[in-house]
Swiss-Prot record:
Protein name, UniProt field: PI-stichotoxin-Hcr2o
GO molecular function: ion channel regulator activity; serine-type endopeptidase inhibitor activity; toxin activity
A Pfam family: Kunitz_BPTI
Species whose genome carries this gene: Radianthus crispa
Domain BPTI/Kunitz inhibitor span(s) in chain numbering: 4-54
Length: 56
């Protein structure tokens, strides 16, 4: 899906939430720390969800 091509966005908030995003350069789902608000669709709660949607 096109959300998998969106850039990683931490967002403006200061929470430290472990999420996963699809890295289009490596073709892999990669963990990152999400701020808790803002962001975009390339933000998954689990590695499994990221892989399922982005076919990684």
């Amino acid at each position: 899906g096109s959300i998998c091509l969106e850039p990683k966005v931490v967002g403006p908030c200061k929470a430290r939430i472990r999420r996963f995003y699809f890295d289009s350069e490596t073709g892999k789902c990669t963990p990152f720390i999400y701020g808790g608000c803002g962001g975009n669709g390339n933000n998954f709660e689990t590695l499994h969800a990221c892989r399922a949607i982005c076919r990684a």
